[in-house]
């Protein structure tokens, strides 16, 4: 049984496809149960964000597991299987562990080192726990990934700038407004309308406040949540008010920016609602999108959304910063520790079985001896039993210790080397010429897995 990841992200798929696979809590729960309904899959956890959809599962069969996950995604999203195969990537066993550590550390995010992803992975884990779909394998891997993410953020300077997708979006909006995002208060004298009152909206309000916004207007379907967000802004020293969600369009003519992060079923901002001649900067932080793209066709109206942010991130620099190198070193360290522990854990059942078998053989031989030598006194018999058990324990002690040490290492070992290592034998010099074997690559069976796009790993340079 090994961990399998099947997913797609901003690196492998267009936003339009990511939108179709985006899952709310209800769909994620249904999809998780559908995954567990497949015989090849025993655990399941789904990470669904604006920039990625990844299924983490544990499978008894790689090929069957991949096909089962793809079929479930097809059933959940309505996207045909061939389209999915063209954009999905696959990670398995150690590569799957590495991928989760890289993702949770923010090293595969659209904004390098962004902190939101660690919370999103934690939320996905908590949801899977509630569904009863997390077992020992995903529990251990997720906890290691979360620990690694915390180390990356606390031990490196990767998030010194407080980068997140929200800050990236607001900074892009400032540039398009002709404002200097590096200035102390570039939004001084400006007013913004924030639609939604969840985590993304709260982050947006915070970032707008840091950028010197003069006033915030909040609107949300649940009025109390909008009022609570406004109170937080007031406590931070930013003037704020609340408008009814259905009356949000009435605020368009008195704001400079509209930031939307509601995840609504319908567009929150439509072209017909924008007053003629209005000058607006629209920022859409939702997936699927909140703001109708057609709004950007209106004179004086500009738009930043997830798709445009993807394009901007691809146009950014490609060099690796020192903090990224430090972060990758932490990932490698944690990955080595995790994979070693997993290999040791995997060998424990075999070691236990070996000890049980040896104990059983010893007991059987003692029974035979007792029948053949009935005249042995109880005191003498007690010494015989102790001696036999000591011999068995001494014979097995070094092999069981060494097999765990060998299991912790990656790579393979020859049979004669294994015997020498396990039992502490002297090197067996052989005068015979070593046997050689050749393999014709063309004769190897076709792997037959779905197509996948390479994503950066802890041993690769970020795009």
Swiss-Prot record:
Substrate binds at residues 49-52, 109, 114-116, 120. Keywords: NADP, Oxidoreductase, Porphyrin biosynthesis. Gene3D superfamilies: Glutamyl-tRNA reductase, N-terminal domain, NAD(P)-binding Rossmann-like Domain. Possesses an unusual extended V-shaped dimeric structure with each monomer consisting of three distinct domains arranged along a curved 'spinal' alpha-helix. The N-terminal catalytic domain specifically recognizes the glutamate moiety of the substrate. The second domain is the NADPH-binding domain, and the third C-terminal domain is responsible for dimerization. Homodimer. Belongs to the glutamyl-tRNA reductase family. NADP(+) binds at residues 196-201. The active site is at residue 50. Pathway: Porphyrin-containing compound metabolism; protoporphyrin-IX biosynthesis; 5-aminolevulinate from L-glutamyl-tRNA(Glu): step 1/2. Catalyzes the NADPH-dependent reduction of glutamyl-tRNA(Glu) to glutamate 1-semialdehyde (GSA). PANTHER family: GLUTAMYL-TRNA REDUCTASE (PTHR43013:SF1). One of its GO terms (biological process) is protoporphyrinogen IX biosynthetic process from glutamate. The record marks 99 as: Important for activity. The gene is hemA. Pfam families: GlutR_dimer, GlutR_N, Shikimate_DH. This is Glutamyl-tRNA reductase.
């Amino acid at each position: 049984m090994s961990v399998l990841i099947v997913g797609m992200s901003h690196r492998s798929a267009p936003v339009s496809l990511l939108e179709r696979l985006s899952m709310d809590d209800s769909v994620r729960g249904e999809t998780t149960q559908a995954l567990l309904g497949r015989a090849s899959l025993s655990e399941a956890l789904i990470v669904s964000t604006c920039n990625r959809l990844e299924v983490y599962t544990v499978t008894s069969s790689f090929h069957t597991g991949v096909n089962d996950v793809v079929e479930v995604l097809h059933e959940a999203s309505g996207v045909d299987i061939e389209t999915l195969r063209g954009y999905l990537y696959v990670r398995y066993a150690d590569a799957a562990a590495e991928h989760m550590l890289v993702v949770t550390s923010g090293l595969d995010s659209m904004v390098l080192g962004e902190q939101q992803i660690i919370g999103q992975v934690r939320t996905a884990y908590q949801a899977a726990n509630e569904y009863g779909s997390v077992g020992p394998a995903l529990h251990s891997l997720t906890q290691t990934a979360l620990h690694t993410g915390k180390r990356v953020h606390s031990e490196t300077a990767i998030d010194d700038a407080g980068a997140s997708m929200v800050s990236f979006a607001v900074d892009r909006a400032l540039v398009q407004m002709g404002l200097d995002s590096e200035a102390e208060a570039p939004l001084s004298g400006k007013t913004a309308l924030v639609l939604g009152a969840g985590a993304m909206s709260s982050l947006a309000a915070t970032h707008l406040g840091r950028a010197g916004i003069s006033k915030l207007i909040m609107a949300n379907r649940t009025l109390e949540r909008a009022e609570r967000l406004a109170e937080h802004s007031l406590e931070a020293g930013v003037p704020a008010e609340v408008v009814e969600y259905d009356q949000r369009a009435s605020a368009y003519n008195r704001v400079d920016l509209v930031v939307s992060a509601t995840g609504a079923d319908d567009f929150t901002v439509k072209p017909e609602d924008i007053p003629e001649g209005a000058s607006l900067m629209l920022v859409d932080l939702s997936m699927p999108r909140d703001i109708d793209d057609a709004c950007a066709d209106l004179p004086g109206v500009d738009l930043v959304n997830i798709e445009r942010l993807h394009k901007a991130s691809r146009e950014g620099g490609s060099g690796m910063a020192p903090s990224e190198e430090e972060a990758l070193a932490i990932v490698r360290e944690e990955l080595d520790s995790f994979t070693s522990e997993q290999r040791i854990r995997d060998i424990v059942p075999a070691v236990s079985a070996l000890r049980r078998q040896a104990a059983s053989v010893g007991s059987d031989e003692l029974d035979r001896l007792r029948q053949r030598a009935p005249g042995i006194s109880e005191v003498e018999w007690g010494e015989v039993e102790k001696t036999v058990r000591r011999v068995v324990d001494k014979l097995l002690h070094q092999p069981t210790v060494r097999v765990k040490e060998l299991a912790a290492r990656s790579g393979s070992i020859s049979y004669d080397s294994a015997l020498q290592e396990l039992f502490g034998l002297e090197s067996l010099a052989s005068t015979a010429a070593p046997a050689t074997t050749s393999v014709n690559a063309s004769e190897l069976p076709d792997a037959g897995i779905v197509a996948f796009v390479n994503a950066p790993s802890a041993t690769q340079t970020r795009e």
